Amino acid sequence: MSRPDDIDVRPIAEAETADWIRALNTGFLRSPEVSEREVADRSSYLVPARTLGAFDNGRCVATFRSFPQELTAVGGASVPADAISNVTVTATHRRRGLLTRMMAQDLAAAKERGDVVATLIAAEYPIYGRYGFGAATHSTEWTIDVPRTGLDPRWSGPGDGGRIDLVDGEDVRKAGPELHERLRRTQPGAVSRDERWWQVHTGVVRLDRSPWTEPFYAVYRSASGEVEGLVSYECDDHWGDAKQPQNTAKVNWLIATTPAAERALWHYLCSIDWITKVRTGWRAPDDLLPHFLPDPRAARVTTHADWLWVRILDVVRALEARTYDGSGTLVLDVVDRHGLAGGRYRLTVGPDGAVCEPTTRDAGLTLDVGELAALWLGDASAVRLAALGRVREQQEGAASVADALLRTSGRPWCPDMF
């Protein structure tokens, strides 16, 4: 067995891309076979300096990459984020500190670049807290039992003057980016999408590892003709024993910038002949969906889990980037064992905005940088975290003050997997 010091952790060279992909596929328990097309495709978007590998005697045994991203803070401001993905360690080389070394390199570079936060979607819950990440958003999936919804089976379109049309991938690529950006600017926790995202999700770029099946696309336009919603969905063509159609519509993604558009698209999906169930895909935990139905119990929660994990790299810029509903002052003692964002900070919130600055004043709360990330987007409760022993009140009532300042009326949501 090689010693950890004998394993080289570094950015990959172009000639090592195929070996890196093989290690990536192996780590995710996929076939290690690598095609020339996959090498060409991944080479088109990998950022060389931010694509790391761990090499043991020239063979790649761990993978890690990051890329630039914009994350929406509470209030709609965007902050630059270091988005992390494709993290694997081959089973033969686990527990040797390879992920720790790759993470340390990447976060140090992100801090130096001026990124405010790092983000990732965690495949396993226990891994990333030790690197200062906290679960900042959650997602919920519902399955709708269409016959139970109470919707009028004669529904034939929105009654608000808007309309729904089926469109093709080209139409989605034209209307989708601007629509999504409008949503992202108002949705804390949402992240930016590049052109490639739209190409992959409309079949322009086809991946060896994910065989492409053309989905259906439907667009909602308001009475004025403005695009306010889009949905991508598939149907499974299932028939029951008595020659009865029992199809399930699986939503790949649905974005809407108004409640009217969201309601109309869900009603449309539930109105399609032969559809008896609708799987919603990953939605915000406080999504309006169940309440768009006359019988909300027809939408049954099938999965609920943590989703976007955030690691704060710059406490001052992160806390000053977001908005707050109230006024007040809070002193936070932020513990960061990796030395990237720790310190004592005084947050002052008033009608003119927020000011955060280092301070020597007594702290009201002591918390790990990962817990601060969970609080930053407004989802977590400092009072609950204190009850769990994950936040320490140094001054009585400080957790309640933190909740009054940091919690939001709507929950953050990240619609994307990356």
From Swiss-Prot:
It comes from the Bacteria. The active site is at Y128, F418. The keyword Acyltransferase applies. Its EC number is 2.3.1.-. Gene3D superfamilies: 3.40.630.30, SCP2 sterol-binding domain. Keywords: Acyltransferase, Transferase. Acetyl-CoA binds at V87, T88, V89, R95, R96, G97, L98, L99, T100. The keyword Acyltransferase applies. Disulfide bonds: none annotated. One of its GO terms (molecular function) is aminoglycoside N-acetyltransferase activity. GO terms for biological process: aminoglycoside antibiotic catabolic process. Residues 7-158 form the N-acetyltransferase domain. InterPro entries: Acetyltransf_17 (IPR041380), Acetyltransferase_Eis (IPR051554), Acyl_CoA_acyltransferase (IPR016181), Eis_dom (IPR025559), GNAT_dom (IPR000182), NAcTrfase_Eis (IPR022902), SCP2_sterol-bd_dom_sf (IPR036527). PANTHER family: N-ACETYLTRANSFERASE EIS. Homohexamer; trimer of dimers. Belongs to the acetyltransferase Eis family. This is Uncharacterized N-acetyltransferase SAV_4024. It comes from Streptomyces avermitilis (strain ATCC 31267 / DSM 46492 / JCM 5070 / NBRC 14893 / NCIMB 12804 / NRRL 8165 / MA-4680).
